[in-house]
Amino acid sequence: AFPDMVSLSRNNAHNTGQRLGIDRWISLSSGKVLAIDEKRRRIERDDILLEYRSNDRTGAPGWINKDLQIDFLAYAFIESRRCYLFPWLLLRRAWLRFGEEWHHKAFGRELGFTLIEAQNPGYVTKSVAVPTSLLLAAVKNASIIDLAASGSTPSPVRPE
């Protein structure tokens, strides 16, 4: 994924970096260091889970609702050995633009969207399952800035 990578290091500690979403650092030959958050699912499905609530008891936000200090989110399916590498700022931009709509569609189980609740000891983690093709299109379109839009922050172009 990074042809100019010179080193890869793992963040195994429970530290500030981990709280900011950093699981790995990739050093490039230019000297730039990329921060990566990793998400894993055993079996590949036609969707990507976006965790919007980490803990239903405390109300802690899920990772998609946090200002993580990462460059990329690596979303891997273990059995198929396929990994989607999402630029974090574009993924967040897509979520901020469409998250409410996706949540509504998931609540109604429309177009492949579903709500997922993962039981943990003493709490539940909540995610929206977004069809992979729709998420990829939304992230792609998040890279297009509409300079004609009113307001201080231009909106991404809505996928068709």
Task: Briefly describe each language-model feature range.
Residues A1-L20, R40-D46:
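Acidic-basic catalytic patches of nuclease active cores, encompassing PD-(D/E)XK
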Residues S7, K39-C83:
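Catalytic cores of nucleic-acid endonucleases
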Residues L20-I22, Q69:
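Short beta-strand or tight-loop elements
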Residues R24-D46:
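Conserved catalytic cores of phosphodiester-cleaving nucleases, focusing on short active-site segments
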Residues S30, E79-E160:
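Non-catalytic C-terminal interaction segments of nucleic acid-processing enzymes
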